[in-house]
Amino acid sequence: MPRPLVLMILDGWGINPDPSNNAVAIGRTPAMDRLMAEYPSVEMETSGMAVGLPDGQMGNSEVGHLNIGAGRVVYQDLTRITKSIDDGDFFTNPVLLDCMARVKAAGGRLHLGGLLSDGGVHSHNTHLYALIELARRQGVKDVFVHAFLDGRDTPPSSGAGYLAELEAEIGRIGFGRVATVMGRYWAMDRDNRWERVERAYNTIVKGEGAHRPDSAAAIEASYSAGVTDEFVEPAVIAPNGSPLGLLADGDGFICFNFRSDRAREITRALTDPAFAGFDRSPWPRLASYVCLTEYDATFPLPVAYPPESLANILGQVVSRAGLRQLRIAETEKYAHVTFFFNGGVEEPFPGEERILIPSPKEVATYDQKPEMSAPLVTDALLKRIDEGVDDVVVVNFANADMVGHTGILDAAVRAIETVDECVGRVAATVLEKGGALIITADHGNAEMMVDETGGPHTAHTNERVPLILVDDSRKGARLRPGTLADIAPTMLGLLGIPQPPEMTGKSLLVATE
């Protein structure tokens, strides 16, 4: 058994045959080039049905880590919720119906807040439309939408189109109004930057921010100032000079994001009695607050689509075998190598340790520091490998994804080169210790930095990703192409641990010499 066996996830590092505007191709990557030439490698599918998403839907970090850790294709929340809308179950969901009943009993209004996007990473606009239709059917007095604009998982200036589509759907349904508009930068932080969340809160609750006559005027004003979707300043829709729909006592709120990590902070701010992130007076006492999926197991809030438990995932199987495992990443991807990798469970398994390296807070966006905390992650990992404590290690390097999201090619190239340097350092140490290294990615991003219009490409891609098996005892091994679900079975095979029946992925190892 190789010790340690290190799974290195290069977040956002995809394979694009077109080298133009491709940070992965442009960057100098001597370590990855050498390892690819010397060791068995293969291309992996990370999008669509291969990871439990709808056909053609790009993968993302949450989905990728869930599939890798589970060793099976995990039916994603997006697919699950969309299917329930199609078959009608959505409209009889007891948690959603209870929320609306409570709002009606309190004489309140219903607020729907979340990412207005069809990017499918954090939310889907069709889920919002279904909620508006459900509220109409249930006879709710008023529905107000708090639209967080995307620009990361969608083109950076696509928000105007999504708002126009929302207004058209509201017109078709004959119900609902847009109350506030803001970029996701404010409402969907995940790194305790409470000053951002405070701006979102103050807009939704207090009506602070620019007052605009309608949603189109709000986005047009932002574009005129050169500010694209992600960073749109919080604006209040006030057609007659006073805000249409501020959140107040007796109202209900449904957060329609299905991905948890960027929905937690705004949810805490709106619901937690002990919240101390900023002064939020007034704090509305709501009739109901519903999370579309489980954002945090400790939140005492109703969940419309609770998690489906996953048995015998990689971390659990490794733990039961009596092996020690380490999860290590910087803040931006720490939840992915822990919570998501463990099937949506926060608690570590016995024998599982975790190291969190803080992401840089001194910059507003990571194009200003493309190396992020990757060198510090590497230093901490090498120290740990030298100590010889762990049997299995999962490490994530966030750079290709987080800097790729900025749409700035030069910065993404520097990010790629930083990660390559870290790969080289880790590979040398692991091999020196007699260990093995699986290098892969959860989805693509930095390999496409310009979109078809010639503008910045800030979203994930549907491209395949590499997988390299760096193991001196298996240089002659043959690998087959696969999906992320096949990585855990491959690792168990290398560790000599039987694969449990719940893991339906297949080992990538075809034959060894």
UniProtKB/Swiss-Prot annotation:
Binding annotation for Mn(2+) 2: 11, 61, 442-443
Family that this chain belongs to: Belongs to the BPG-independent phosphoglycerate mutase family.
Keyword Manganese assigned: yes
Subunit structure, as described in the record: Monomer.
Gene3D superfamilies membership: Alkaline Phosphatase, subunit A, BPG-independent phosphoglycerate mutase, domain B
Active site (UniProt): 61
HAMAP family xref list: GpmI
Gene Ontology biological process: carbohydrate metabolic process; glucose catabolic process; glycolytic process
Reaction(s) this enzyme catalyzes, per UniProt: (2R)-2-phosphoglycerate = (2R)-3-phosphoglycerate
Protein task: Catalyzes the interconversion of 2-phosphoglycerate and 3-phosphoglycerate.
Gene symbol of the encoding locus: gpmI
Organism: Geobacter sulfurreducens (strain ATCC 51573 / DSM 12127 / PCA)
Keywords, in A-Z order: Glycolysis, Isomerase, Manganese, Metal-binding
Cellular component aspect of the GO annotation: cytosol
Molecular function in Gene Ontology: manganese ion binding; phosphoglycerate mutase activity
Name of the protein this chain belongs to: 2,3-bisphosphoglycerate-independent phosphoglycerate mutase
InterPro entries assigned: Alkaline_phosphatase_core_sf (IPR017850), BPG-indep_PGM_N (IPR011258), Metalloenzyme (IPR006124), PGAM_B_sf (IPR036646), Pgm_bpd_ind (IPR005995)
EC number(s) reported in the record: 5.4.2.12
Cofactor note: Binds 2 manganese ions per subunit.
Pathway(s) it belongs to: Carbohydrate degradation; glycolysis; pyruvate from D-glyceraldehyde 3-phosphate: step 3/5
